[in-house]
Curated annotation (Swiss-Prot):
The keyword Nucleotide-binding does not apply. PANTHER family: 40S RIBOSOMAL PROTEIN S15A. Gene3D superfamilies: 3.30.1370.30, 3.30.1490.10. GO terms for biological process: translation. This is Small ribosomal subunit protein uS8. SUPFAM superfamilies: Ribosomal protein S8 (SSF56047). GO terms for cellular component: ribonucleoprotein complex; ribosome. GO terms for molecular function: rRNA binding; structural constituent of ribosome.
Length: 130
């Protein structure tokens, strides 16, 4: 697999389209950090790490509104292995005028656009979530 983060986002997008309660993805440190951001920003209910004597599995519990409205409207991969996209500290993008979240890989770890702006760091723009 050439782009595991794109696979992670696609699995969430596909499960969200058919209103699945949970989705399982192969685990990694980056995916765990992305799941933590999704949870903290209120896009998923929870996630758990399952040990399987290999790389492990992340089980994400998706969140829906009272009338089955999707909380995650869209996920978009920005920086991919063939075309890396970087943003300086003053050029950090806003997603939908601040309604969405940009996930940025910085020297201080994987942060949301708001946290990166507050800490004054730039980095690689991984994805947009809205």
């Amino acid at each position: 697999m050439t782009d595991p983060i794109a696979d992670f986002l696609t699995r969430i997008r596909n499960a969200n389209m058919v209103y699945q309660e949970k989705v399982e993805v192969p685990a990694s440190r980056v995916k765990r950090a992305l799941a933590e951001i999704l949870k903290n920003e209120g896009y998923i209910k929870n996630y758990e790490y399952i040990e399987d004597n290999k790389q492990g599995i992340l089980r994400l519990y998706l969140k829906y509104g009272p009338n089955k409205e999707k909380v995650i409207t869209g996920l978009k991969r920005i920086s991919c292995p063939g075309l890396r996209v970087y943003a300086k500290k003053g050029e950090i993008p806003r997603v939908l005028g601040g309604l969405g979240v940009a996930v940025i890989s910085t020297s201080k770890g994987i942060l949301t656009d708001k946290e990166a702006r507050r800490q004054g760091v730039g980095g690689e723009v991984i994805c947009y979530i809205w």
